[in-house]
């Protein structure tokens, strides 16, 4: 989502709170919990899942392996739920022509560097760059080239933009910032 006026461009960046992340975290949690439940029921010899008798799964080796996969899956699921609740990767890009300042803000993981805030002068922006890689893992990323700082990505690698969409966004941003556009 973006908001634009004559002198201000504000681009809101969606973080890890996407529908696909919610679905993967839920599926992983339910599957790993079921694995742990089957492994525990095979250890105790009780039938907690009515799909099959507990005597069919021996604790050693099947129950041990299923318990291990269940515990590992619960750890990965808890990691996904934490990134969703912290909304890692969300933030905004603010381009202010009136003040001549560009601000880039992102939320990170908890700790000393939870808030990632970058601030530049517009006169230090050399160009807007599109990096396109074709093939099996095709990706298109929009960068902002800063004098003395290198290239800063403005889009996520997970976003699959069509060539027309990324070119249009780059052209609009380059026109707004009054800098050239490069394609690699």
Curated annotation (Swiss-Prot):
Record-level GO cellular component terms: chloroplast thylakoid membrane; photosystem I
Membrane-spanning ranges: 22-42, 57-77
Keyword Plastid: yes
Source organism, top-level taxon: Eukaryota
Keyword tags: Chloroplast, Membrane, Photosynthesis, Plastid, Thylakoid, Transmembrane, Transmembrane helix
Entry membrane topology: Multi-pass membrane protein
A Pfam family that the UniProt record links to this protein: Ycf4
Record localization: Plastid, Chloroplast thylakoid membrane
UniProt GO BP: photosynthesis
InterPro entries: PSI_Ycf4_assembly
Function: Seems to be required for the assembly of the photosystem I complex.
Family in the record: Belongs to the Ycf4 family.
PANTHER family named among the record's database cross-references: PHOTOSYSTEM I ASSEMBLY PROTEIN YCF4 (PTHR33288:SF4), PTHR33288
Protein known as: Photosystem I assembly protein Ycf4
Species annotation: Pelargonium hortorum
Lineage: Eukaryota, Viridiplantae, Streptophyta, Embryophyta, Tracheophyta
The gene coding this protein: ycf4-A
């Amino acid at each position: 989502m973006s908001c634009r006026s004559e002198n201000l461009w504000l681009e809101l960046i969606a973080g890890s709170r996407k529908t696909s992340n919610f679905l993967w975290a839920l599926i992983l949690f339910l599957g790993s919990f079921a694995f742990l439940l089957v492994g525990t029921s095979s250890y105790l010899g009780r039938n907690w899942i009515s799909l099959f008798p507990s005597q069919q799964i021996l604790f050693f080796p099947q129950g041990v392996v299923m318990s291990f996969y269940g515990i590992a899956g619960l750890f990965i699921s808890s990691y996904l739920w934490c990134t969703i609740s912290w909304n890692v990767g969300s933030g905004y890009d603010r381009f202010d022509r009136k003040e001549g300042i560009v601000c880039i803000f992102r939320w990170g993981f908890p700790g000393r560097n939870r808030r990632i805030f970058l601030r530049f002068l517009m006169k230090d922006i050399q160009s807007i760059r599109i990096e396109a890689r074709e093939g099996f893992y095709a990706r298109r990323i929009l960068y902002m080239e800063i004098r003395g700082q290198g290239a800063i990505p403005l889009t996520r690698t997970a976003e699959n933009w069509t060539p027309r969409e990324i070119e249009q966004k780059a052209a609009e941003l380059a026109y707004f910032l009054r800098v050239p556009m490069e394609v690699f």
